[in-house]
Amino acid sequence: MIRATSVTAKFDRAFDTITLDETARHRRRMMMRSDNGIEFLLDLPEARLLNHGDGLLLEDGRVIEVRALPEPLYEVRGRDSRHLLALAWQIGNRHLPAEIAEDRILIRRDHVIRDMLEGLGAMVTDITAPFSPEGGAYQAHSHDGHSHHQGHTHDHHD
């Protein structure tokens, strides 16, 4: 069984593609099948979100490009930027995955949340789009046996 052991953003041409929703794109180790039927084992050192456009590097050097499957979502808009920030706070307070842009927030469909947001004056529209929610504050990646939270950097000295 061929394995994909790393993710790359730099590749000239993909051998194949794999189209996955957001939940299926957050993996470490799993049997997968490409869009054209190639079976492979995703075998990464740690769990991570595979982003649209990432390449899964197979052991033989071929690359399978990740595509984000459009999902049923809500597009949430506020009256102005202050209102959108307040809506983002409400969404975050409920620990909901959210993709945040300057003028809108995307969340998974949930009629209870929709009712709440509309009750707060939000404009909520049903859409179908790829979903790439923000990483959490405690989501970290590791280097050389220790970890850094996103946004934290420093030099390493021997």
From Swiss-Prot:
Report the record's Gene Ontology biological process terms: protein folding; protein-containing complex assembly; urea metabolic process
Which keywords describe this protein according to UniProt? Chaperone, Cytoplasm, Nickel, Nickel insertion
The record's InterPro entries line, in alphabetical order, gives: UreE (IPR012406), UreE_C_dom (IPR007864), UreE_N (IPR004029), UreE_N_sf (IPR036118)
Top-rank taxon, per record: Bacteria
Q: Which terms in the GO cellular component ontology are assigned?
A: cytoplasm
- A Pfam family hit: UreE_N
The region called Disordered is annotated at: 133-158
Q: What is its main location?
A: cytoplasm
For this chain, one GO molecular function annotation is: unfolded protein binding
Q: Biased composition, Basic and acidic residues: where in the chain?
A: 141-158
State the family named in the UniProt similarity comment for this chain: Belongs to the UreE family.
Q: What's this chain's function?
A: Involved in urease metallocenter assembly. Binds nickel. Probably functions as a nickel donor during metallocenter assembly.
What is the protein named? Urease accessory protein UreE
